[in-house]
């Protein structure tokens, strides 16, 4: 190869079979603007801004589908609990999958607050003061004491008349339904799920304080949680169903549980993921949607999207631009 003499030589264009027409453009704040104008500007922003716009389009496409919503416990610890509760209250989502920590966080917040703090607080100092840090949030240990007292009373009630030899058998989703019916607080996700008959699945429900409290309870042998029956139930949520869709904040067990259930109908038609996990360690948490296609959990040719970023920033924008919008001049997902 000859030594390049100019920029044209360096560029070395030898083919002409690719073309692009959509120019990169950002928000023009010198023109009249509103929230939806900002959201529409993400289409040509590039990087995760453009993926966020694609997520808006995908949610528009899924609105007539059965929507599975999943999230991890830290999502419920944050202010996103209020956003999710609104979606459940208005029946915008139809099946929930939440980690055990998320179940207990929702219950606790119905009685006691979580506080904003700082990522850099000293762990030992927090421990001595009876405070537990979740990122830049803190939860007083006394909140868990209140949860224990509340849950113990419920276990006493629901195991009345049962024995260790003939225990009461509940699926985790049935148990969670009972908890939701006992909550008298409209800020709660479980409250609205029970009220609107929206199932809440939690395959790892005992991985956290709920499991600890149940294990401490003197009547623990009188209550059995049937996890296998719940796997059957969530799989049946998809069989013979029309179009299904998923919105998943975070990853791990909630992501796999939703995607695996949709394997039983040959895959989701629509999907939006928001997380920061990478696929390079082979984990399901970081796996791309295309990998899910290879397992039959997402249908080929779908326009699902994964947005890399912090759900506490991204999800309120998505909800405001789709489920809760007032401005109708938005993408129709076509």
Curated annotation (Swiss-Prot):
The entry's keywords: Hypusine biosynthesis, NAD, Transferase
Residues given in the record as spermidine binding sites: 104-105, 212, 256, 282-284, 291-297
Listed EC numbers: 2.5.1.46
Pathway terms, separated by semicolons: Protein modification; eIF5A hypusination
Cofactor needs: NAD(+)
UniProt xrefs under SUPFAM superfamilies: DHS-like NAD/FAD-binding domain
Transmembrane regions: none
A GO CC term assigned to this protein in UniProt: cytoplasm
Catalytic reactions on record: [eIF5A protein]-L-lysine + spermidine = [eIF5A protein]-deoxyhypusine + propane-1,3-diamine
Catalytic site positions: 297 (nucleophile)
Enzyme class: transferase
GO molecular function (one): deoxyhypusine synthase activity
InterPro entries noted in UniProt: Deoxyhypusine_synthase, Deoxyhypusine_synthase_sf, DHS-like_NAD/FAD-binding_dom
Residues that coordinate or bind NAD(+): 73-77, 99-101, 105, 207, 276-277, 310-311
NCBIfam families assigned to the protein according to its UniProt record, in alphabetical order: dhys
The family this protein is said to belong to: Belongs to the deoxyhypusine synthase family.
Physiological role: Catalyzes the NAD-dependent oxidative cleavage of spermidine and the subsequent transfer of the butylamine moiety of spermidine to the epsilon-amino group of a specific lysine residue of the eIF-5A precursor protein to form the intermediate deoxyhypusine residue.
Name of protein: Deoxyhypusine synthase
């Amino acid at each position: 190869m000859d030594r390049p003499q100019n920029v044209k030589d360096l560029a070395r264009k030898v083919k002409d079979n690719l073309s692009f027409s959509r120019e990169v453009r950002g928000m023009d704040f010198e023109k009249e603007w509103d929230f939806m104008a900002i959201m529409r500007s993400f289409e040509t922003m590039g990087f995760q801004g453009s993926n966020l716009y694609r997520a808006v389009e995908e949610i528009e496409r899924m609105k007539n589908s059965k929507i599975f919503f999943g999230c991890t416990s830290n999502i419920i610890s944050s202010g996103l609990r209020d956003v999710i509760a609104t979606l459940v209250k208005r029946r915008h989502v139809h099946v929930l999958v939440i980690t055990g920590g998320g179940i207990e966080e929702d219950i606790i917040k119905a009685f006691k607050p979580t506080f904003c703090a700082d990522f850099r607080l000293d762990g030992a100092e927090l421990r001595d003061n009876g405070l537990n840090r979740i990122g830049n949030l803190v939860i007083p240990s006394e909140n868990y004491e209140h949860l224990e007292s509340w849950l113990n009373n419920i276990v006493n009630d629901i195991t009345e008349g049962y024995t260790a030899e003939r225990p009461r058998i509940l699926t985790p989703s049935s148990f969670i339904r009972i908890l939701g019916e006992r909550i008298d607080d409209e800020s709660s996700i479980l409250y609205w799920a029970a009220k609107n008959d929206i199932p809440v699945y939690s395959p790892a429900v005992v991985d956290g304080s709920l499991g600890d409290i149940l294990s401490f309870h003197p009547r623990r042998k009188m209550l059995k949680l049937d996890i296998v029956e719940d796997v059957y139930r969530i799989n049946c949520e998809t069989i013979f169903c029309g179009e299904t869709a998923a919105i998943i904040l975070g990853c791990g067990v909630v992501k796999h549980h939703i995607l695996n259930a949709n394997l039983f109908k040959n895959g989701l038609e629509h999907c939006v993921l928001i997380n920061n996990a990478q696929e390079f360690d082979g984990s399901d948490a970081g796996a791309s949607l295309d990998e899910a296609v290879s397992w039959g959990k997402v249908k080929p040719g779908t326009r699902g999207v994964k947005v890399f970023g912090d759900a506490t920033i991204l999800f309120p924008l998505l909800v405001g631009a789709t489920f809760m919008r007032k401005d109708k001049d938005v993408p129709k997902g076509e």
